[in-house]
């Protein structure tokens, strides 16, 4: 028996609030196959930034996270920065938006759209 331990990354989560809002947006679009694509790109004031888009296709390397009938998709490169994260939806004085609570981020910008690892 070897002393090596296997590593299983923590999954990502889509909160009920985010799933409800996503469901409403998909219904407005009239395409029940749409999913929320969450991705990470270089840039922003902290080094990386989050992005959101609709996707109606899923790549071979994509990970699908579901909550009820709502689904989000994350590409393999972005997933490594988002492991263990929670995607939520909030409404407040700053407006309504999807947000990411990322335990891997060592710092974030004031608006929460960019982060550093």
From Swiss-Prot:
Its cofactor is iron-sulfur cluster. Iron-sulfur cluster binds at residues 45, 109, 111. It comes from the Bacteria. SUPFAM superfamilies: HesB-like domain. One of its GO terms (molecular function) is 4 iron, 4 sulfur cluster binding. Pfam families: Fe-S_biosyn. Keywords: Iron, Iron-sulfur, Metal-binding. One of its GO terms (biological process) is iron-sulfur cluster assembly. Binds 1 iron-sulfur cluster per subunit. Homodimer. Required for insertion of 4Fe-4S clusters for at least IspG. Belongs to the HesB/IscA family. PANTHER family: IRON-SULFUR CLUSTER ASSEMBLY 2 HOMOLOG, MITOCHONDRIAL (PTHR43011:SF1). This is Iron-sulfur cluster insertion protein ErpA. It comes from Chromohalobacter salexigens (strain ATCC BAA-138 / DSM 3043 / CIP 106854 / NCIMB 13768 / 1H11). The lineage of its organism: Bacteria, Pseudomonadati, Pseudomonadota, Gammaproteobacteria, Oceanospirillales.
